[in-house]
């Protein structure tokens, strides 16, 4: 059969690509060699974080948080979307200085990131072990459960018209005239 777009890979990027293209009215086929989210996309930490990003990525991640909230509302399951924040610990004063420098970028984008002293880290994370001189915390950062979220997004893509084919490895691409 024919498709406007064939997406190879059923991880979070492939599934979201198929979803947004299907919602835009494209005829989409997604091919996954195993099962949806069966590789790295089911094994990552699921962070949807602004903290520590390259300054040019911060607006993209702010938009990503909005998109993830909207997607969570469309699913039929709890994808574990939480806004619990992200904390990076500093073990040296040099790391703290790096976090202070990054904080200037965060302020320019109105993020809620803040520096933590060693006591502030212990207050925020009372069970933390090991030594640290402080850290940085961004309360608005989010997390989803990837092994639940990606299949749920694939279901939304299928409802939007994407055809999702699992256990279908792509071994080669035949192209003619650049297509």
Sequence positions of predicted segments:
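Conserved dinucleotide-binding and phosphotransfer motif residues
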Residues: 24, 109, 160
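Gly/Ala-rich phosphate-binding loop of Rossmann-like dinucleotide-binding domains
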Residues: 18, 22, 156
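A short, glycine/Asx- and small/polar-enriched loop/turn
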Residues: 94, 125-133, 174-179
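Dinucleotide-binding Rossmann-like beta1-alpha1 core, especially the glycine-rich loop
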Residues: 45-124
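Helical element adjacent to the flavin cofactor pocket in flavoenzyme catalytic cores
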Residues: 136-179
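Short loop/edge segments at beta-strand edges and connector loops
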Residues: 32, 117-118, 166-168
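Glycine-rich FAD pyrophosphate-binding loop
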Residues: 22-42
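Beta1/beta-strand and adjacent pyrophosphate-binding region of the FAD-binding site
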Residues: 1-13, 29
């Amino acid at each position: 059969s024919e498709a406007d777009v064939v997406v190879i890979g059923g991880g979070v990027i492939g599934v979201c690509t198929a979803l947004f293209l299907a919602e835009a009215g494209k005829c989409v086929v997604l091919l996954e060699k195993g099962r949806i989210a069966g590789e790295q996309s089911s094994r990552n930490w699921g962070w949807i974080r602004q903290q520590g990003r390259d300054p040019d990525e911060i607006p993209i991640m702010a938009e990503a948080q909005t998109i993830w909230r909207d997607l969570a509302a469309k699913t039929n399951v709890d994808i574990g979307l939480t806004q619990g924040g992200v904390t990076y610990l500093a073990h040296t004063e040099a790391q703290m200085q790096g976090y202070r420098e990054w904080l200037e970028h965060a302020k320019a984008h109105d993020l809620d990131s803040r520096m933590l002293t060693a006591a502030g880290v212990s207050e925020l994370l009372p069970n933390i072990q090991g030594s640290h001189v402080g850290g940085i915390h961004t309360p608005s950062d989010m997390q989803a459960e990837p092994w639940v979220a990606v299949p749920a997004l694939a279901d939304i893509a299928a409802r939007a018209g994407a055809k999702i084919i699992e256990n279908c490895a792509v071994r080669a691409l035949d192209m003619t005239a650049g297509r």
